[in-house]
Amino acid sequence: MSKRDYYEVLGIERGADQKEIKKAYRRLAQKYHPDRNPDDDTAAEKFREVSEAYEVLTDEEKRSAYDQFGHAGVDGQAGGGFGGGGFGGGAGGFSDIFGDVFGDIFGGGGRRNPNAPQRGSDLRYNLELDLEDAVAGTTVDIRVPRHIECEHCDGDGAEPGSTKETCPTCHGQGQVRMQQGFFAVQQTCPTCHGAGQTIKVPCRKCHGEGRVRETRTLSVKIPAGVDTGDRIRLNNEGEAGLNGGPPGDLYVQAAIKPHPIFERDGRHLQCEVPINFIDATLGGELEVPTLDGRVKLKIPPETQTGKMFRLKGKGVKPVRGGPPGDLLCKVVLETPVNLSDEQKDLLRQFQDSLDGSNSHHSPKKTSFFDGVKKFFEDMKP
């Protein structure tokens, strides 16, 4: 299958300068990037084709060979492949074989264009949310420090009007090969640090980095039902790419703050409801809090501490859809404090009225002490 013209692939004229090439590549790379087109083989092929065209046309030597001889002038150079002379000067000899192996170990992996576009790094932002905001959904503003492309030099690293020069040490390859006896070891060029080019006049804004650091305020929409550990992805809001590569993404990771009343367990909420022994004994009606407001909870007579009551649909609606969870209310018996002498006397009278009566007033207590009595009797010889 014949290859398309590289200028046609990028949609530029043959006399386009590096800035125009980079601009065209950035637009097409973002359009066909695999992250934006998952499981799309056509887009993946387009992305590979665009990247290959950019790799050739941003390398002065390869572009010159391509302009003169077409694809025949650069076949075997674009897209990787460990070129160069082999052991004893022949192509594909022992030196190339061992160079590939040791290149992988020492940071090489074969000769490639050092100016090929590189995607920016992804960033993570930890966002603490109140439970109410996490359940209902909200919009928050966050401040994110990151690197962006330098506007002064358009990410080139060189002062506008100046040019980059081919590295005299690696001759534009970004790597140097060191012969160590029988083996050839490939290492990053110490002069250009793998760039393949040197900057004669660095950009006065970014000092040759091609990127500058800024802190940007972003508005993030938090969907209802988000939970601790959930991540919200903001495309292209990560670190700026290198050599015209697309930016990375920003992942906002949610963490729900502790709540004074409720504990969350997935889509369910839990809370403790204090109750006095009169209501627990005779029954009654209590007001309990929910995230939607107060509701009535009916307490049946003879309710024991620790009993759980379930309020259907008063929990959290899952972020990925589905019915809301429940609110689980655990009744906790509260012992009265700061009683007057008169109140204490009334309680003693009440206690006296229970003494000697049938054990059904305190079945658990009776069962417990009956068990203790039997335990010690069984221990007797």
Swiss-Prot record:
J domain: residues covered: 5-70
Keyword Hydrolase among record annotations: no
Molecular functions (GO terms): ATP binding; heat shock protein binding; unfolded protein binding; zinc ion binding
Cofactor(s) this protein requires: Zn(2+)
Top-rank lineage group of the source organism: Bacteria
Primary location group: cytoplasm
Repeat region (CXXCXGXG motif), residues: 150-157, 167-174, 189-196, 203-210
Gene3D superfamilies in alphabetical order: DnaJ domain (1.10.287.110), Heat shock protein DnaJ, cysteine-rich domain (2.10.230.10), Urease metallochaperone UreE, N-terminal domain (2.60.260.20)
Keywords: Chaperone, Cytoplasm, DNA replication, Metal-binding, Repeat, Stress response, Zinc, Zinc-finger
Signal peptide: none
SUPFAM superfamilies: Chaperone J-domain (SSF46565), DnaJ/Hsp40 cysteine-rich domain (SSF57938), HSP40/DnaJ peptide-binding domain (SSF49493)
Ligand binding (Zn(2+) 2): C167, C170, C189, C192
Zinc finger (CR-type) boundaries: 137-215
Description of its domains: The J domain is necessary and sufficient to stimulate DnaK ATPase activity. Zinc center 1 plays an important role in the autonomous, DnaK-independent chaperone activity of DnaJ. Zinc center 2 is essential for interaction with DnaK and for DnaJ activity.
Record's subunit section: Homodimer.
Protein name: Chaperone protein DnaJ
Organism listed in the record: Chromohalobacter salexigens (strain ATCC BAA-138 / DSM 3043 / CIP 106854 / NCIMB 13768 / 1H11)
